[in-house]
């Protein structure tokens, strides 16, 4: 079949000369044929059969050569030669299809070739073409239709115009391999034998034959378009029509002169009554196909010319010719309708890799003054040049980091950007400086921190003012714990105040998310004065109770205007706690004996002397606290973490509902804002910072995961 597929392309001229000589000889022999109907039957012993096969095979291959897009492009022969050859040709020879040398007994489609061609020749001999079974012509099998696209249907539609053609060799790229034989469309697998078709041909009138031919042309068109898309979409270029699912590579046109009939496309624009819209199975394009058998010659030629020029247009696209724009500007209706009906997939959005591309520059802010500098970074007061808003710029310290961006700052940015609560400081955005080493967090500006305010105050807060501040603190801590976040560094210097009486929790550098069951964490968290006893004793599994201990220490500091436990070391801190609250034991703190730091001998003090520091009534200037207030403070400073009060339970405590009631935020005392110099001169007593302790141990080479008693 390979020889039949491509071999006839190069010896066309020799075959045509031989066929012309045989055509005149056959015209004489036709008159002496013994069959009464005048229709020739192909015999195995007839010396003319081999010439018929060669001529029919050449013509079948020539038809495919005209349209398959794999080989050479052909031009239609002159009309004088066509008319002369039509007179010499038998009426039934057009229907012989592809004459291959390898088969003799398989049936061929009679309606596809015999009926349509004879109806267009208009000869009455075909109407009486019923023959005896003994001398019936044997048709060649449709081997070509299984392996390659259908012959160009323009030959069938034009009738006398394009029965035969002369090959024209053009320098084209070598043909790609054809699809495999086992990939056969379902439409082409159904064939009819001549025994089933020819009796109906003999009894029909020429008008009926014409209608049958028209319907066969439309069926051919459907089969051809489907086969064309299946066989050629596999070889389409990757850069052609990327937006469409499967690019289409069209077949070559018959002649450049066919483009002159583009103006006739308007008749085939809209489908008439009874037309069916068939979808190409490989390209996603819809093509309007007609099932009406009443449309004849001129309309067929117009439709076929549209398809032919459609193929030529895409060939120009594939070949990269420069006249694409001129051709497309002259196109009408059907090709554009087909293109417009194709839903183009939406392109995926362009994804950026630079994570800091959307960050603003720090130059868009005007620095006013330096507020504070601590372990975690430097804080500036600045003004947004666009909006005029006063904000706080916290610069992340990068010079001490050996492994990239600081983990503490990453956690803080991640948590604060995901939280929004009135009692938690709001981080608006992250801005960058001239390099990646200068990164700033833009936060809302708060005039004071609680520690600086208390140092500036001459008198401690009243109980109503303490209740107002404690309610805001507990609401913020409850929000954190409800979202599975441990702050792990609650202290008065991390509580910000403004002149509207609002309190906000800040500095989430040590905070982290936790889960259930608990996982071991480092105990080097929380500033020493506010660190829970279980952390001081070396436990690694802790939960929200460590934050509630810090809340209790803050409450006591608000009432007394000084820290409750101000030890300088872990041992001294535990000693101060035990002297005030009593030495714990297994009875009041289950699991206490298993803690790592219990091996050290502490002072044995069995009494809780917290009430002595916060009496109900005082004549010596000590801070007073009601029974309900003392109960709340005592439950917050419980040794056993399981019995320690939670934030939700603390908010429901009766102390907040007794007289004096919490003061409104609007009536809270205000203070002038302090700059960095004022803060440094006012702070005489500074609590040890856990990160400073850890950095000091790293410098000394004594990095440990255990506490003092490990």
From Swiss-Prot:
The keyword ATP-binding applies. Residues 365-656 form the Protein kinase domain. The keyword Phosphoprotein applies. Induction: Down-regulated by cytokinin. Residues 124-133 have a biased composition (Low complexity). Transmembrane segments: none annotated. SUPFAM superfamilies: Protein kinase-like (PK-like) (SSF56112). Residues 299-308 have a biased composition (Acidic residues). It catalyses: L-seryl-[protein] + ATP = O-phospho-L-seryl-[protein] + ADP + H(+); L-threonyl-[protein] + ATP = O-phospho-L-threonyl-[protein] + ADP + H(+); [DNA-directed RNA polymerase] + ATP = phospho-[DNA-directed RNA polymerase] + ADP + H(+). InterPro entries: CDK, CDK11/PITSLRE_STKc, Kinase-like_dom_sf, Prot_kinase_dom, Ser/Thr_kinase_AS. The active site is at 489 (proton acceptor). Residues 31-40 have a biased composition (Basic residues). Residues 8-30, 41-64, 144-163, 183-195, 209-218, 335-344 have a biased composition (Basic and acidic residues). GO terms for cellular component: nucleus. The modification Phosphotyrosine is found at residue 376. Signal peptide: none annotated. Residues 170-182 have a biased composition (Pro residues). Belongs to the protein kinase superfamily. CMGC Ser/Thr protein kinase family. CDC2/CDKX subfamily. This is Cyclin-dependent kinase G-2. It comes from Oryza sativa subsp. japonica. The lineage of its organism: Eukaryota, Viridiplantae, Streptophyta, Embryophyta, Tracheophyta.
């Amino acid at each position: 079949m390979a020889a039949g597929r491509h071999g006839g392309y190069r010896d066309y001229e020799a075959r045509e000369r031989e066929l012309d000589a045989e055509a005149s000889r056959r015209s004489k022999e036709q008159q002496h044929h013994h069959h009464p109907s005048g229709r020739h039957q192909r015999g195995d012993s007839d010396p003319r059969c081999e010439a018929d096969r060669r001529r029919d095979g050449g013509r079948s291959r020539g038809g495919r050569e005209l349209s398959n897009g794999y080989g050479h492009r052909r031009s239609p022969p002159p009309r004088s030669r066509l008319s002369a050859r039509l007179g010499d040709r038998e009426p039934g020879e057009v229907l012989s299809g592809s004459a291959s040398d390898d088969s003799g007994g398989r049936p061929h489609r009679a309606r596809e070739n015999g009926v349509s061609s004879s109806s267009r020749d208009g000869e009455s001999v075909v109407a009486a073409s019923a023959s005896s079974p003994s001398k019936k012509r044997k048709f060649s099998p449709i081997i070509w239709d299984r392996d390659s696209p259908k012959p160009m249907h323009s030959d069938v539609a034009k009738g006398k115009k394009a029965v035969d053609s002369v090959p024209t060799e053009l320098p084209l790229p070598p043909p790609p391999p054809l699809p495999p034989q086992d990939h056969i469309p379902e439409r082409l697998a159904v064939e009819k034998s001549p025994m089933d078709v020819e009796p109906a041909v003999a009894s029909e009138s020429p008008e009926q034959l014409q209608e049958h031919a028209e319907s066969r042309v439309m069926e051919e068109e459907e089969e051809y378009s489907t086969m064309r898309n299946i066989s050629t979409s596999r070889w389409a270029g990757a850069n052609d029509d990327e937006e469409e699912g499967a690019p289409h590579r069209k077949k070559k046109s018959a002649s450049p002169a066919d483009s002159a009939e583009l103006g006739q496309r308007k008749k085939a624009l809209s489908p008439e009554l009874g037309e069916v819209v068939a979808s190409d199975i490989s390209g996603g394009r819809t093509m309007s196909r007609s099932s009406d058998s009443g449309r004849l010659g001129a309309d067929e030629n117009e439709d076929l010319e549209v398809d032919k020029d459609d193929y030529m247009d895409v060939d120009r696209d594939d070949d990269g010719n420069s006249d694409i724009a001129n051709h497309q500007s002259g196109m009408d209706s059907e090709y554009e309708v087909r293109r417009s009906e194709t839903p183009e997939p939406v392109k995926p959005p362009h994804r950026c890799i630079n994570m800091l591309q959307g960050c603003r520059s720090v130059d868009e802010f005007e620095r006013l003054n330096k507020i504070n500098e601590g372990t975690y970074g430097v804080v500036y007061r600045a003004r947004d040049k666009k909006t005029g808003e006063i904000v706080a710029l916290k610069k992340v310290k990068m010079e001490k980091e050996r492994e990239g961006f600081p983990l503490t700052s990453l956690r803080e940015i991640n948590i604060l950007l995901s939280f929004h609560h009135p009692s938690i400081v709001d981080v608006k955005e992250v801005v960058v400086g001239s390099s990646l080493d200068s990164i700033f967090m833009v936060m809302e500006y708060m005039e004071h921190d609680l520690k600086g305010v208390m140092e500036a105050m001459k008198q401690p807060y009243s109980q109503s003012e303490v209740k107002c501040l404690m309610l805001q603190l507990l609401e913020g801590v409850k929000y954190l714990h409800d979202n599975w976040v441990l702050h792990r560094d609650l202290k008065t210097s991390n509580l910000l105040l403004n002149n509207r009486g609002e309190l906000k929790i800040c500095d989430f550098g040590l905070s982290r998310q936790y889960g259930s069951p608990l996982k071991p964490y480092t105990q080097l968290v929380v500033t020493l004065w506010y660190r829970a006893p279980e952390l001081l004793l070396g436990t690694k599994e802790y939960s929200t109770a460590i934050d509630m201990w810090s809340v209790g220490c803050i409450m006591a500091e608000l009432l007394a205007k000084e820290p409750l436990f101000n030890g300088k070391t872990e041992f001294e801190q535990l000693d101060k706690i035990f002297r005030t609250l009593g030495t714990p034991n297994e009875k009041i703190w289950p699991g206490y004996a298993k803690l790592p730091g219990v091996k050290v001998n502490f002072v044995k003090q069995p009494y809780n002397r917290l009430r002595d520091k916060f009496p109900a009534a005082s004549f010596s200037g000590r801070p007073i606290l009601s029974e309900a207030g003392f109960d709340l403070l005592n439950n917050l400073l419980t040794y056993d973490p399981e019995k320690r009060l939670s934030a939700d339970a603390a908010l429901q405590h009766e102390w907040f509902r007794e007289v004096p009631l919490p003061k409104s935020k609007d009536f809270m005392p205000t203070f002038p804002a302090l700059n960095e110099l004022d803060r440094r001169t006012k702070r005489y007593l500074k609590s040890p910072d856990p990160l400073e302790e850890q950095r000091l141990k790293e410098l000394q080479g004594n990095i440990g995961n255990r506490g003092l008693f490990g």
